Amino acid sequence: MASTNALSSTSILRSPTNQAQTSLSKKVKQHGRVNFRQKPNRFVVKAAAKDIAFDQHSRSAMQAGIDKLADAVGLTLGPRGRNVVLDEFGSPKVVNDGVTIARAIELPDPMENAGAALIREVASKTNDSAGDGTTTASILAREIIKLGLLNVTSGANPVSIKKGIDKTVAALVEELEKLARPVKGGDDIKAVATISAGNDELIGKMIAEAIDKVGPDGVLSIESSNSFETTVEVEEGMEIDRGYISPQFVTNPEKSIVEFENARVLITDQKISAIKDIIPLLEKTTQLRAPLLIISEDITGEALATLVVNKLRGILNVAAIKAPGFGERRKALLQDIAILTGAEFQASDLGLLVENTTIEQLGLARKVTISKDSTTIIADAASKDELQSRVAQLKKELSETDSIYDSEKLAERIAKLSGGVAVIKVGAATETELEDRKLRIEDAKNATFAAIEEGIVPGGGTALVHLSGYVPAIKEKLEDADERLGADIVQKALVAPAALIAQNAGIEGEVVVEKIKNGEWEVGYNAMTDTYENLVESGVIDPAKVTRCALQNAASVAGMVLTTQAIVVEKPKPKAAVAAAPQGLTI
């Protein structure tokens, strides 16, 4: 028995090379020549064990997770909403921001956590597209999913229900676009910002003041202040619609952004692929201990790899973005950035090569912020005269052009050069209060720009309640019975945010919803004053874009949940038992 085992072990452990040589020698003896091809080694990867749930079990587990997360987020909705304490790293945070709460929640049960992850997705998508309305989107999604699953459990076709939901939401979005009215002046801007900041009038006033200074095409930046006061300052700057080439350049992982202060700026229309072209420049900026921002046509291959590796090792403090625009417009935009930063544009058609660039030819940016899809450059005041001269030149070109496209692009460039950046410096007595205020101001800023973009509608969930009155007409156009069920689900879900706002204010939600339904489009419930009034006139307004994105994203994720029949999650590993204390020791 032992010899058999020894033989089998030998045959298994024999190296592939020896086996190949033996086979080769046999074939050479038989035929005189052979084409040798070695078989590749094969690796087997064993996946972790999974738990699988089907049908009602999977749906109920997901629903439980969705409810837990939506309940926590829903507490913050409305002017009478509560705060939530997040105990993460360092001191606990007191927040009133839906997406921040959603991102912080991880449930211990993996199946419930899968449901919670879907609501996190709704909140994140709404935050990315509109910048606000994350709580409303989460509540809408929970309600559509809950009502939809009840119908699916009763035997309705989930695919048809999803189609009905999608068709109804698409029709409601068209109605919303017709009903939204454009922003009229600073009072509307102040009202939108105040509501989004949790009815903080001071923040609303500051946002309105900042936009008044930089205009609707300007940029608002939020920073921490060294004092207890919150102030607004306007600084020269420009926003570019290009983000970092590689996420490895990120300096602030929490926000996934690059932040530089007193950075040198290289501006060129050339493609950089060989590291030897920029090594002299990297050495000089490293000696100056200054960060380096590279704006070029592209950075690829060896150059990009070297920059990333040295950035990760802490040797270089560098980031790179692609040049904005295309063709001749790209050169014009790069010249704008060069004038803003005081750099010399390294243009290939002028024979100015990157490898010959000196420190004196680099620009200087007091602050640079780069996200995945945009870059904000705040320049030094030294280039102000040249900047004004450039703006005057662009205005002259604008007056002479007949092209609508060119006039739009020139107006955009003038706004970016002359508007500058309004910096809101946030102050607070404690770190916890500072974080909360910054989140509120961020929401207010995003909501304000969303309102300028697509107009405003009555707030407090009122617009959604009134939209529910348009559903019966949409439903009549649907022929399939299950699709009509989808329309009914949307109609019932639309009243949930208004009902929850009233509930958080201590009022019966259903009563409030019925009174809103019987009123005009702009009339609704003001939870702050506990009255029914014209919300637009009293300043309780929401951006139409926020309402639209909340509804679309909620319906999108809800449709995916309703058409889900099984969940596959990783099986939790059993925790190791605590070792017993050795005998004779006192614990």
From Swiss-Prot:
Belongs to the chaperonin (HSP60) family. Residues 1-47 form a transit peptide. Residues 1-33 are annotated as: Disordered. Residues 1-25 have a biased composition (Polar residues). This protein shows ATPase activity. The keyword Phosphoprotein does not apply. SUPFAM superfamilies: GroEL apical domain-like, GroEL equatorial domain-like, GroEL-intermediate domain like. One of its GO terms (molecular function) is ATP-dependent protein folding chaperone. It comes from the Eukaryota. InterPro entries: Chaperonin_Cpn60_CS, Cpn60/GroEL, Cpn60/GroEL/TCP-1, GroEL-like_apical_dom_sf, GROEL-like_equatorial_sf, TCP-1-like_intermed_sf. Its main location: plastid. Oligomer of probably six alpha and six beta subunits. This protein binds RuBisCO small and large subunits and is implicated in the assembly of the enzyme oligomer. GO terms for biological process: protein refolding. Keywords: ATP-binding, Chaperone, Chloroplast, Nucleotide-binding, Plastid, Transit peptide. HAMAP family: CH60. GO terms for cellular component: chloroplast. NCBIfam families: GroEL, PRK00013.1, PRK12849.1, PRK12850.1, PRK12851.1. This is RuBisCO large subunit-binding protein subunit alpha, chloroplastic. It is found in: Plastid, Chloroplast.
